[in-house]
Structures are given as C-alpha cells and as structure tokens.
Regions:
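Fungal secretory targeting signals
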Residues: 1-22
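Exposed, interaction-prone regions of secreted/extracellular proteins
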Residues: 20-306
Length: 306
C-alpha cells in the first residue's frame, strides 16, 4: 500500500529498538502481544521483526520460523491440527502458485445468548508451512467475540492478528482511541492482497501481504502487513475458540462469507476445491455452499442457530 511505501525510508536508518511485553496469555499459556494497527512484520532468518507504522522497531520474535531462502514456496502436505478448538474451510495452493488476492464479505450474525468469558476468532486469512509441511503461521483478520485475547467483551469487534504456530503466541493489532466494535447486521469486507517481492536494507527479499478490512468502517478497523520469505500455502476461513461450554455460547445465526474471490498472479484458478478440517471438534457445521475461485460462498452454522 502507498502508506508503507512512504515510510519505507525509515528502515534504512537506525531506529529506536524497544521490546514488547506480553499483555496477556491464552488459557493454554500462549503469550499475546499488542502492536498498533498499520504495523509491519518482516522475516529476518528465523526471526520476525515488528515495526510500528513510523518505522520504529518494536519487537523481535526470535526463532519462530524455519530458515528459508526465496523463492521457496513452503508448499507441502497439510498436517491435521492437534487441537480441539480450531476448525477451518481451506484450499491448498500448488507449489508454483502465488496468491494475488483473497477477498470476501460477511454480515455480522446475531450474538450469543450467553456470555461466560468465551472467546471466538472467526477469521479469514493465509497460512504458511514450515519445512516439514506443518502449519507455521496464520495471518488474518477476524470477527472476534469475547474478550480473553487482549481486547473485546460480550460483543463483536474486528481483529487483525499474526499467529505463530503451533504454540508461539499471537501479535494482535490495536487502534488508539478508536473502538473496532462491530454491530449485528453490519456488512464487512476482508481483503488479503499480495504487494509483490520487496527488498529492505538488512533483510532478504520477501513476499509482502497486506491484510485489512474493507467497507465504510474500514478506517476504524485494524490492518497489518507481513513480509515472509515463503509464500502462503493454505488459504481459507478459520474458527478458533476457547471457553465454549454450551450451544448458547455461539452466535444464534449463521456466519456466511459471500462473494469469495481467490485470485492467483496467473488469474483465477479454473478448478479449486474447498476442504473442511476440524468441524467435529468445534461443533460448528462448515458448509461449502458454492465452490470455486469466483463468487464462492462459505457458511458456518452454529449449534444454537435456530
């Protein structure tokens, strides 16, 4: 995006280096870090370096990725996720595929009827794999309900985050003096866009992706840009939950991702299959209403949906 091209010079000069401290932990003990919306995260060998929008280095996540050199894609077999709190609808890209754009819209569903500190990330994004083919990171934006992950409460907000898999923690993007709260029946768009191969002083060339919300409230919702030396291998919709104990802890209506567009740098794939993983563990019914790469539709039906 133009914003990041403007501040690119900041990476060529010494910047003040600070270190983020975890602002919280998940119930399983994984650390949660916060950075301002618009931050940029770049891979440096096995580390991921976080820069504020003004170019100031905020943090280094050490040894969270395997060492890679471009143009490796990292594409390999999808490993089943060893967790009872995650489900996803996804497609796996080919070894020679580069994701250009992944867009969709959704309408915020009716809220759960009970709140008992449960947490949900209902997200859209991209997953990279490590050298063994196991998931290494997930970059996405989400409809968040609940407040155990730094933000939120018994209401919906828009969240942007980078998750280091399987247990490296989260970087959550936040806005200053702006509430990212979303209301039931709001229509929201999500956009994942390839910015190209970038070169920054002190970093090996990396594949740059911007992930953001779109629509009338986009300025009040978080955004993140991430550069890694490996292309995303998995693209899809993901549910992550904690503290769900009964059907009424879920939204009382379905969440439907519509107008799903998945474009490669070579164009829209003529054949694209969406797969489902982990639905039984979450209790959510994942439905591929319409497949393919153009105008696809993915529906999440919750146990309390009536």
């Amino acid at each position: 995006m133009l914003f990041f091209r403007i501040v690119v010079a900041a990476f060529a000069v010494p910047a003040v280096v600070v270190a983020l401290a975890p602002t919280g932990h998940t119930s399983s003990g994984r650390p949660i870090y916060e950075a301002p919306s618009g931050s940029r995260v770049l891979q440096n060998g096995t580390d991921m370096v976080v820069f504020a929008p003004n170019g100031t280095q905020l943090h280094v996540f050490e040894n969270v990725v395997g060492a890679r050199t471009p143009p490796s894609t990292g594409t390999g077999p999808l490993r089943p996720r060893q967790t009872d709190t995650i489900g996803q609808v996804y497609t796996t890209l080919g070894a020679n595929d580069t994701l250009q754009a992944f867009n969709a819209t959704f309408v915020v569903p009716p809220a759960p009827t009970t709140f008992d500190s449960q947490f949900m990330f209902l997200s859209q994004g991209i997953t990279t794999l490590d050298d063994t083919g196991a998931p290494a990171s997930f970059l996405g934006v989400a409809l968040q309900y609940g407040g155990s992950f730094v933000q939120g409460g018994p209401f919906y907000i828009g969240a942007a985050f980078l998750e280091f898999l399987p247990d490296g923690g989260y970087l959550v993007l936040t806005l200053i003096d702006v509430s990212p709260q979303l209301n039931v029946s709001d229509t929201v768009g999500i956009s994942v866009t390839y910015q190209g191969i970038e070169n920054e002083p002190g970093f090996a060339p990396f594949y740059d992706y911007n992930v953001e919300f779109t629509g009338s409230d986009a300025a009040n919702l978080p955004q993140i840009e991430v550069g890694q030396q490996v292309l995303p291998a998995i693209v899809g919709f993901r549910v992550e939950e904690e503290g769900i104990s009964e059907p009424s802890d879920y939204p009382t209506g379905p969440l439907t991702f519509k107008d799903v567009q998945l474009e490669l740098t070579t164009g829209f794939p003529k054949k694209l299959d969406w797969e489902i993983d982990g639905a039984a563990a979450t209790g959510i019914d994942f439905k591929v209403v319409k497949g393919g790469s153009k105008n696809a539709e993915i529906k999440l039906v919750f146990p309390d949906d009536s």
